[in-house]
Amino acid sequence: MPEIENHLGTLRQKRGISAAELARTAGVTRQTIYAMEAGSYIPNTAVALRLAQALEVKVEDLFALPQAEPVGLRSEEATLLPGSDALHPGQPVQLCRVNKRLVASPPSPVPWYFPVSDAVVASKLPKNGRTDVQVFDAGDDFRNRILIAGCDPGISVLAHHLQSAGVELVLAHRNSSQSLKLLKEGCVHIAGTHLRDESSGETNLPEIGRMFPRNSVAVITFAVWEEGIVTATGNPKSIKAIEDLARRDVTIVNREKGAGSRALLDSNLKRLKIDSKNVKGYDRVAPGHLQAAWHVQSGQADCCIATRAAARVFGLGFIPLLSERYDLAIRRQHLDMPSIQTLLDTLNRSNYRRELESLGGYDTRAAGQRLL
């Protein structure tokens, strides 16, 4: 039996009550009070309650079990997802098993709350792409999870529906080029992409064909979305087309190299023979559709290239430029995973499609169709 913490003597003396007086109130002898204070006698429930009442405290203030030592965290070595920001000891990470190795992905930070995580980086910093992590749940092997790299905010809707089906989706925020590179390196199960080939006008398939051996990757449509110019609410700068981005009174926020939205902007600037040096803010980047739209909403930029859904989240204006497919590229050896099969089934569910379309700018009629 664990030793009981006993504060009876301390509290009695603090109240200025003699052992004899307390003994009378509790219905015991003075010797019993001394024995309890010495820890050689444990009172029954009735005596403990009378003692607490006499001293005007709770029973647990008098007698308590010592606090259990915290369970030690399990230490594991994990592969740091390439392209992650520099890690520091104690940084939260999410974990997923991909091709039998444990991959650590730092969740995207949100200023208002701690990110959902499975472990923290240990004091030993990453070396050769690997790092030690301290795992919270010793019983979790992180196998019933899918690690997906992509930039479509709508993937969070898919994650919510998958969670209801018992599958966890871990999202690593990357642009299209970065996502395909991670898939090629075997670091993720799925890469989300929207890269338009300028010569053919086709989306995603040409780039995937260049990067991967034939028949090694399946391509599934996630949705067709609208991309365009996101403006401040009410469009105070009267921006109507790409040409207006070269005006001196207009400032944009761009996307990073490799992003489909940046490629869309560049192709339009090239078509119109506009030098990017004449576009104010061209070299300032935001890592994502929602982040770019937030820059506009907060007044840090007059416009950006993003999706209609991103504009709608912040109540911003939107000028459509094109509709394009956002596809999911999956290594064929992963197609038979039960979790992947659940994901593909979810893409065809009407309740999921309705929710995604309600965000604005999404057409899900082709969702779940296999293109390759």
Where are these regions (language model features)?
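N-terminal hydrophobic or amphipathic helices and topogenic motifs
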Residues: 2, 9-13, 18-21, 29-34, ...
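Short loop->beta-strand "edge-of-pocket" segments that line small-molecule binding or catalytic clefts
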Residues: 141-151, 243-262
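Ligand-binding cleft/hinge of the Venus flytrap
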Residues: 157-165, 243, 248, 261-281
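Short helices/loops that flank or line small-molecule/ion binding pockets
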Residues: 160, 177-191, 195-196, 285-300
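Short beta-strand-to-loop elements that line the ligand-binding cleft
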Residues: 168-175, 276-288
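A ligand-binding cleft/hinge motif common to bilobed small-molecule-binding domains
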Residues: 194-208, 293-322
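Periplasmic-binding protein-like
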Residues: 214-226, 316-345, 364-372
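Flexible hinge/capping segments at coil-to-helix
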Residues: 222, 231-252
